Amino acid sequence: GTTPNSEGWHDGYYYSWWSDGGGDSTYTNNSGGTYEITWGNGGNLVGGKGWNPGLNARAIHFTGVYQPNGTSYLSVYGWTRNPLVEYYIVENFGSSNPSSGSTDLGTVSCDGSTYTLGQSTRYNAPSIDGTQTFNQYWSVRQDKRSSGTVQTGCHFDAWASAGLNVTGDHYYQIVATEGYFSSGYARITVADVG
């Protein structure tokens, strides 16, 4: 079975959990900024903990265990409205680079590594406002890691310099684990460190 989709506040942090119901995935809110996901047997899922609303510039510390088998991302992940944008600052990933299908916008040096910038468009896809067409912004770390601090402002500034609109109204901003027809385990703790 799969944990039903939900979102809201838990122990001082905002969480979001979504799956397409196609696999077996369990999402658990642990104390404070910690969550746990076990997944397998197909399907698409994404969940994690963080804040609502997000900020263009927040210092996000994350640490924990991330053990994917197949296509998966560990990212600072969120949405804006006006414009509707889904964004990923990818810190670690499984078998395939998530930005491979996006328009290459060059690289930026942030948080002690080089990140590859990209943009892609999703057509008639699930969003925070139902089925919509919207842009995705990507910043993908080359030196993968499962703990560290992300200065989101570095990435939003880089997207802006590449011509992307970063003036939207923030919805949630979480450190999310995503799986796509894969399996794995993650237990991640997040904190706002300025």
UniProtKB/Swiss-Prot annotation:
User: Where in the sequence is N-acetylglycine found?
Assistant: G1
| MF (Gene Ontology) | endo-1,4-beta-xylanase activity
InterPro entries membership: ConA-like_dom_sf, GH11/12, GH11_AS_1, GH11_AS_2, GH11_dom, Glyco_hydro_11
Which pairs of Cys residues are joined through disulfide bonds in the record? C110-C154
Entry note: thermal dependence: Thermostable.
Recorded metabolic or biological pathway in which this protein acts = Glycan degradation; xylan degradation
**Active site per the UniProt annotation:** E86, E178
Gene3D superfamilies given in the database record: 2.60.120.180
What does the record give as EC number?
Answer: 3.2.1.8
Q: Which Pfam families match?
A: Glyco_hydro_11 (PF00457)
Residues forming the GH11 domain are: 1-191
Q: Which domain of life is it from?
A: Eukaryota
Q: Which keywords belong to this entry?
A: Acetylation, Carbohydrate metabolism, Disulfide bond, Glycosidase, Hydrolase, Polysaccharide degradation, Xylan degradation
What is the reaction catalyzed? Endohydrolysis of (1->4)-beta-D-xylosidic linkages in xylans
Q: Which GO terms describe its biological process?
A: xylan catabolic process
Protein family (similarity comment): Belongs to the glycosyl hydrolase 11 (cellulase G) family.
How is this protein named in the record?
Endo-1,4-beta-xylanase
Please tell me the species this chain comes from: Byssochlamys spectabilis (Paecilomyces variotii)
